């Protein structure tokens, strides 16, 4: 039984995401995946599950609010069919009219942002969510909102979030206690650990911004 639990946690409880520029354009449903597939190819199924769950009203409201924060004209995201979805439409409110656009017609940045939201809000939630360079293709205003969503996810009990980034703008949204440094030591072994104590203090005293750990004063790992 313990082996089964461990296997399930490793295979279904972890999501690893590095969304490509054409994310959310594929119509492959990938029904065998548990939760959002790593390439988000089954996004139609995930959208359907969120949309049909009576318990997910707060989830739908959270996603809608985040989308409206980056584009106030967005009224909704709807599927063409609940039973057998083939397309998703983004409704844009223009005056007293709503203009529906297919999801694949939206910008790369919008689709990437939305894909991250689907990963963060999927049901059931993953135990661990890993995102590789989530800043790619996201404009600065949306990046701030995405950072807020990353931080809110574990607080809401929707899983641990691990990010890898080379973006000073994204790193600026996280405190010293959130940051881990990855280094390759002299034995060519990967070491991961908290930020060096002197750099932590510099951040807390606002002598250094977190983003400057990638530019001005490269991040160092605390000695063991």
Name these PLM-found stretches.
Residues 1-124, 213, 219-220:
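Phosphate-coordinating catalytic segments in nucleotide- and nucleic-acid-processing enzymes
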Residues 132-133:
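Walker B catalytic acidic pair
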Residues 144-224:
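C-terminal lobe/lid and adjacent interdomain/linker elements of RecA-like ASCE P-loop ATPase modules
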């Amino acid at each position: 039984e313990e082996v089964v639990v461990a296997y399930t946690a490793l295979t279904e409880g972890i999501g690893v995401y590095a969304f490509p520029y054409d994310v959310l354009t594929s119509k492959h449903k990938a029904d065998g995946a548990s939760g959002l597939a790593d390439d988000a190819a089954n996004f139609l199924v995930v959208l359907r599950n969120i949309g049909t769950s009576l318990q997910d009203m707060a989830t739908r409201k959270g996603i809608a609010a985040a989308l409206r924060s980056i584009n106030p004209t967005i009224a909704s995201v709807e599927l063409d069919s609940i039973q057998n979805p083939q397309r998703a439409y983004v409704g844009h409110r223009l005056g007293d009219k709503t203009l529906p656009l297919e999801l694949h017609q939206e910008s790369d940045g919008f689709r990437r942002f939305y894909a991250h939201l689907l990963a963060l809000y999927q049901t059931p939630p993953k135990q661990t969510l890993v995102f590789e360079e989530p800043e790619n293709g996201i404009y600065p205003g949306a990046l701030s909102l995405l950072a807020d969503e990353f931080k809110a996810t574990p607080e809401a009990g929707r899983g641990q979030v691990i990010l890898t980034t080379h973006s000073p703008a994204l790193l600026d949204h996280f405190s010293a206690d959130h940051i881990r440094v990855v280094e390759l030591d002299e034995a060519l072994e990967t070491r991961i650990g908290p930020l060096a104590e002197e750099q932590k203090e510099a951040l807390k005293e606002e002598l250094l911004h977190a983003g400057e750990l990638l530019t001005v004063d490269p991040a160092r790992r605390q000695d063991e």
